[in-house]
Amino acid sequence: MDIKSKSLEELTDLCDTLRDKILKTVSSNGGHLSSNMGAVELSVAMHYVFDVSKDPFIFDVSHQSYAHKLLTDRWNRFDSLRQFNGISGYTKPSESKFDYFVAGHSSTSISLVVGACKAIKLKGENRLPVAVIGDGAMSAGMAYEALNELGDRKYPCVIILNDNEMSISKPIGALSKYLSQMMAGQFYQKFKARVNQFLSYVPDSAAYMAKRFEEGFRLITPGMFFEELGLEYIGPVDGHDLKELISTFTTAKLMNKPVIVHIQTIKGKGYELAEGPKEKWHGVSPFNLKNGQSVNQANQKSATNIFSELLLNLAKKYENVVGVTAAMPSGTGLNKIIEVFPDRFWDVAIAEQHAVTSMAAMAKEGFKPYIAIYSTFMQRAYDQVIHDCAIMRLPVVFCMDRAGIVGEDGETHQGAFDISFLNAIPNLNLVAPRDEESFKNIMEFSYAFDSPLAIRYPRGNFILNNEYKSQKTALAKGEILENGDGSVAFIGYGNGVGKAVQTAKKLNFKPTIVDLVFAKPLDKELLLQIAKTHNKWYVFSDSAKRGGIGEILAGFLQENLLTNILIKSFEYEDTFIKHGKTSVVEDYLSISAEKISNTF
């Protein structure tokens, strides 16, 4: 969409149209609402001032990219947002040439800017990288690693810091606002350059005094930190004032240096309900536009809610139980526990590495730490799991939510890989509940367990709802849930047990159904017992096939020279799994109970 010829009035009308389109689509499909509603004017101003056909537009996480998608080549397809084979909720180059990079995890944008700047310089091209990063993403260390290099290299670029009042403090008083307005004008930037030129000619003593005055001057402005890093700072700027945004971006574009443009926006702008509790409206399921109520009310407790209740009970029972989450208190259910025990449970912002290492120290001091984290974000703390927890065999418990297919968030968020990359770590044990009762037993076991433990559980509900009596959890002990009538064994892990049960109900024979419970260490005694009478093993797990439960069990058979047993796993093939409803995606991957049953 070409908007460069539009008047300010026409651009304002366009913002209203974009906001209406986003609101109606997200209410129907679900998605990230409040951050995108707040970034409409920002996106329009970016497309008006910069050249999206050549300038890399880089959206951190890309929770703020919906308007950008609509302004490029996806207006007519936007109704398919987050649907299978539809528009992704995140930036995705395979979807559009105007999406510079895949996004989904936080705080990568400034590093991408630095890399793009280096490439542009080496290629001798005239392009200007432009990044949008939220104040929440600025809580992660990677952003500061990139800023550190950027301030030293001085590559021309524009970093738009979208402050929607989730992390960064408000500017101080009228003086700060006045100084920021001055800094946003081209006149001030030219004046500042002339002053610096003048200082190069005056005696050292006078220059020193002038420099000291300038440093003191900056102490009362919000950009002091960035300027001390060697970056130009403009702001704060009203992120909903199109005229001011266009003027500010034009100034930044002409500066030929790294510029931080600090804008302030309102999350949920334009939808009164979403302008209220910010966290509630960040990521939403389909909802009623009139009252904001979710369309799909769950009849069964989610795995997240079960975990939250169980951990709260442990915390009430044992005073040494502590916990942490990395910017996901609501998503992991830790928010309810933080309210009750604010001195023992913490949200440490987007800092998975810090979260793990800090809890390792608490374990060393005699506390029992629980780390509530999404499976996909465990990837960000892999070194800390090995170096700071496993080597010393510290009793840290990793509670990994969103294991398996997470649905509409797609490739960057699927919890497919945790079994594969954690199984290789010595001293780390892997366990998964199949339902609420088994989860309760595992959590009770976890408190007394004296080594690192990783518990994985799905987004939403368990497939099973306590249909089978759960045994007290013991290390490396699985369970036989049903004895079959032949030589076929269905071996499930976690929510995969439910899939095994679903599949068995569709068959004309009765397989033996086994809950592995532990992926590491395995219940070798139970597996050897099954091997005596079952020469066909079918494995069910919501995880990657490479390094997954099937390969773990195949390795067990090989080690024990059980070459007569046929083994086949129903896990994810070696591919990144696209977005869409979980049931639709599983059917596409041929791992739904219906598709699996058709293979027998």
Swiss-Prot record:
GO terms for molecular function: 1-deoxy-D-xylulose-5-phosphate synthase activity; magnesium ion binding; thiamine pyrophosphate binding. It comes from the Bacteria. GO terms for biological process: 1-deoxy-D-xylulose 5-phosphate biosynthetic process; isopentenyl diphosphate biosynthetic process, methylerythritol 4-phosphate pathway; terpenoid biosynthetic process; thiamine biosynthetic process. Coiled coil: none annotated. Keywords: Isoprene biosynthesis, Magnesium, Metal-binding, Thiamine biosynthesis, Thiamine pyrophosphate, Transferase. This is 1-deoxy-D-xylulose-5-phosphate synthase. Mg(2+) binds at residues 135, 164. GO terms for cellular component: cytosol. SUPFAM superfamilies: Thiamin diphosphate-binding fold (THDP-binding), TK C-terminal domain-like. Binds 1 Mg(2+) ion per subunit. Binds 1 thiamine pyrophosphate per subunit. It comes from Campylobacter fetus subsp. fetus (strain 82-40). Its cofactor is Mg(2+); thiamine diphosphate. The keyword Transferase applies. Catalyzes the acyloin condensation reaction between C atoms 2 and 3 of pyruvate and glyceraldehyde 3-phosphate to yield 1-deoxy-D-xylulose-5-phosphate (DXP). Signal peptide: none annotated.
